[in-house]
Amino acid sequence: GSMRVCFRFASDQTRPQFEDPKWANYTTIKASNDAVLEYHYDPKGNVRPWDRTLYVKVVKGFLREGDTITITFGETGHGSPGMRLQTFLEDTFEFHTLVDPIATYNYQPLPLQPSIRIVAGPPVDYVAVLPTLRTAGQLFALRIKGEDGWGNPSDQCDLTLSLKANLDIVGLPETITLKPGIDSVTIEGLMVKELG
């Protein structure tokens, strides 16, 4: 039998490699009962949208109920820095897994798909988001957020920022605090009395 672990084509994750344990993206695949496995990565190995495919086949031995195949993406035990998954946030990043248990090439999805949550890293930059155009007397909002190295809103901010504008803004506080667990703060009801 064999299996496929598939990823969506609309992703910027790196591709696994199996040759050099010191390089990025080093991936290991092992059977719990020491069955011999053959594997490779094929960016077009399955039907879209799940076309980026890691293919694993049992070529010597077999698996019984309870035996497992363990795949470690970005194995760091021998010096690899790991593997970069996609750089954008997702609550359920799926390792879409299909199995062909009796070697008929009729792949079936697992009833429960393995998934992880892709979260933002620590902030490396802070961004203020405002409307492009507003007239004097028209209300607007200001949103302030920390962004990680990939531009994702980070919920790991923990600081107080001083706010200063080049003209008088009604309702603008002197400071704003970004706390852990919150990815942005919005200040509503702001207004300028004159054009600037």
Regions found by a protein language model. Give the residues of each.
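Ser/Thr/Pro/Gly-rich, low-complexity intrinsically disordered stalk/linker tracts of secreted
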Residues: 1-141, 149-151
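Short Trp-Ser/Thr-centered turn/loop motifs at beta-strand boundaries
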Residues: 107-114, 154, 173, 184-187
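Short flexible loop/turn segments that cap and initiate beta-strands
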Residues: 88-93, 139-141, 145-175
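Surface-exposed loops/turns
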Residues: 65, 136, 155-156, 180, ...
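Alpha-helix capping and helix-loop boundary segments enriched in small/acidic/polar residues
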Residues: 131-135, 175-179, 191-192
